[in-house]
């Protein structure tokens, strides 16, 4: 017994450095505690017994840490590590636990009636002696585990092993779905969430979902503060529990009309895809000066504050602008009519002009194209639209028509004989606008507009004559046309802002500074 005590005392005094290797020494076992420490006489013998207790706890801690506790841990590493370290203390028999409680003076803890230990310095409650011992190192400054390469010291061996991987560059944790590798297990766990499909964490204020709870908590703080600054109620959406069955959600979605739900899904998905290039800032009556805005923040955080009813309004405007019939795929026109760009806009009640003596072409293909195409020309032309602007050179790059053609014609619309009830616009008499109905088929092939892909195939394009921008996707064109006002094409259909020309209108839509009057 004296030899064993001498060996333990030499280990406590620092003659033998703590092991830093990854292989645990399974042969080391905790030293037995003397049966009756209270009857020990003499200060020297009492000091020896205290050192034996401390050495015993330390050996148990080292063996526990070496048996797989050197895994990667982040912000929750201390709590998790301490709980696992205390598992060995729970395996002690009753007499051993009683003897350890009487010798807590070496650890510096106070045994509570519920069996837990209380730190005599700060009062924190620990679940076992191992946890208390690691906690006491934060007070004493003891760092027994030291790196032999740079000299950095740590309170736990798991932290040392993780630090050693910085020198070796080892990344043992690898993703089985991609080439991602990391040094920490928790980092791999967080990375695997990016491959998952579901987003179980949902905000009760705006309904946005997240994959991680931490992202939801950050969003809730921003979203709730924004709603309070706008004077809106604390909850715009009913709080949906995370354990909501997916089948119930699917049944609720089926209640929506098939055609409307399909359109909304298509439009919403396209809006989400282009959110990174079109930041939206929605402001209330307080104005720009009263609403703080961080220009360095990404759009992902800014767009989270956008309320869902605002997006629904924009989507509904696009549907009302083009009508349900126009959202269906267009009927392919004959080859003879492919010269004219098909552009949809049933905004006005159009009627086919019945002019007497109108010469007709001998080709039936051109006749069908003339019947389906009507040209609307504005009586008032804005000369400033032709002025070049350095900041809008990208829009001018899509202009392929001549100046004479622009002054001669304004907007080309493909009606496809849509019934008047399918359109949601206003008639010409109600608008009091002087539009002339002209022929759309141009006999000059130089006025034709064609877009050819890299493979040489002709692509179908949709052109907004208000902004003179081409779209290769019909849904994107539909969303864009929904931004134009019903009465004035340069009036924002979301907030009512009036622009002077297409440049100002495009800048307003791109910046997304929509001002809404909320009651």
Swiss-Prot record:
The record marks 188 as: Required for both pericentromeric heterochromatin localization and DNA binding. Residues 154-163, 180-195 are annotated as: Required for both high-affinity DNA binding and pericentromeric heterochromatin localization. Residues 468-471 are annotated as: Required for binding PP1CC. Keywords: Activator, Cell cycle, Chromatin regulator, Chromosomal rearrangement, Cytoplasm, Developmental protein, Disease variant, DNA-binding, Isopeptide bond, Metal-binding, Nucleus, Phosphoprotein, Repeat, Repressor, Transcription, Transcription regulation, Ubl conjugation, Zinc, Zinc-finger. PANTHER family: DNA-BINDING PROTEIN IKAROS (PTHR24404:SF36), ZINC FINGER PROTEIN (PTHR24404). Belongs to the Ikaros C2H2-type zinc-finger protein family. It is linked to Defects in IKZF1 are frequent occurrences (28.6%) in acute lymphoblasic leukemia (ALL). Such alterations or deletions lead to poor prognosis for ALL. Chromosomal aberrations involving IKZF1 are a cause of B-cell non-Hodgkin lymphomas (B-cell NHL). Translocation t(3;7)(q27;p12), with BCL6. The N-terminal zinc-fingers 2 and 3 are required for DNA binding as well as for targeting IKFZ1 to pericentromeric heterochromatin. The C-terminal zinc-finger domain is required for dimerization. This is DNA-binding protein Ikaros. It comes from Homo sapiens (Human).
